[in-house]
Amino acid sequence: MAMAMRLPAISRAVTEVASAPVGLRRLFCSNASRFSFLSPQAESQTPARPQAEPSTNLFVSGLSKRTTSEGLRTAFAQFGEVADAKVVTDRVSGYSKGFGFVRYATLEDSAKGIAGMDGKFLDGWVIFAEYARPREQSQSYQPQNNMSRPPYYGNR
C-alpha cells in the first residue's frame, strides 16, 4: 500500500528522466507496474501503514549520501519558510543514512513542500516527501521509577 501511495511520484520521475536526452542518446525508462513482483492477492494482504496526520514536520527519504542538511534546506526553502532541516547521518562514517527531516513554519508551507518535492530529483536521486509520523515507543521499554533499581547490574 505504501508503494501505491508513491506511484504518482515515481511515474513523474520516470517521465522526467525519459524526456531528457543523455548525450546523443535517449534513456529508455518504463513504469514497472506491469512487472509487479507481488501478486494482486499478496498486495491486498499487505497491511497498510496508517497515514500520518498533517504537521509542519516532513520525513524525506531517498536522499543521496552526498546530500547535506544545508542542501536539503535549500531545496525545500523555495516552497516556504524552513525552520529546520536535518539529514540523519551515520555516527561512525558521517555519511547520510538516506533520509532526513524538514520542519516548516506553517502547515501550508509543509503541504507546498510535499507537493513540490515528492518524486523530484535532489543530488541525482529521486526523493520522497511525506508528513512525519511520531516515533512509537517500543513495548520493551517501560519507564520506571529511578529509585527502584540501579540502571546497570554489575558483578555482585
From Swiss-Prot:
The keyword Membrane does not apply. InterPro entries: Nucleotide-bd_a/b_plait_sf, RBD_domain_sf, RRM_dom. GO terms for molecular function: mRNA binding. Keywords: Mitochondrion, mRNA processing, Phosphoprotein, RNA-binding, Transit peptide. One of its GO terms (cellular component) is mitochondrion. GO terms for biological process: mitochondrial mRNA modification; mRNA processing. Residues 56-134 form the RRM domain. Residues 137-156 are annotated as: Disordered. Residues 1-28 form a transit peptide. The modification Phosphoserine is found at residue 64. Residues 137-148 have a biased composition (Polar residues). It is found in: Mitochondrion. The keyword Kinase does not apply. Its main location: mitochondrion. Involved in C-to-U editing of mitochondrial RNA. Functions as minor mitochondrial editing factor. Controls 6 percent of the mitochondrial editing sites. Interacts with RBG3/ORRM3. Binds to RBG2/ORRM5. This is Organelle RRM domain-containing protein 2, mitochondrial.
